[in-house]
Amino acid sequence: MPRPIRCRRVEFLPKFKYFSPAQGTSDEVTLKIEELEAIRLKDLEGLMQEECAQKMQVSRQTFQLILEEARKKIADALVHGKAIRIEGGNYVYGKCSYICLNCGKVFDSDYHECPECHSKDIGCTRGRGRCYCFGHGRR
């Protein structure tokens, strides 16, 4: 059984969610919210990959995979004249609060371990200890 996908933290939700070529097309690609966030952090903000991964609360490898997929979709749309729809994904908007499953302390998500007892056994308070935020970001 595969591991559940952790939510990716995003700090930006787009106002415009659909872009199409001047000559209408029925073909489109769907860019997930976390893919747009990866593009924003790396290409627009100019952050290093490690900083981007920390902001999104994913590993560097996962961040790289998200970024590659986003760039591939955007290139496909531009080269082949497809529309881009931005929606969906597994993400949480803003900051989650986390709880230490060892001592029960609730703290900000910027920590990777409990600031009280230094346990790494932590989870998102939205998921009752574990972060299974599937669809939290769907609007």
Curated annotation (Swiss-Prot):
Gene3D superfamilies: Winged helix-like DNA-binding domain superfamily/Winged helix DNA-binding domain. Pfam families: DUF134. It comes from the Bacteria. Coiled coil: none annotated. PANTHER family: PTHR37478, UPF0251 PROTEIN TK0562. Belongs to the UPF0251 family. This is UPF0251 protein Csac_0224. It comes from Caldicellulosiruptor saccharolyticus (strain ATCC 43494 / DSM 8903 / Tp8T 6331).
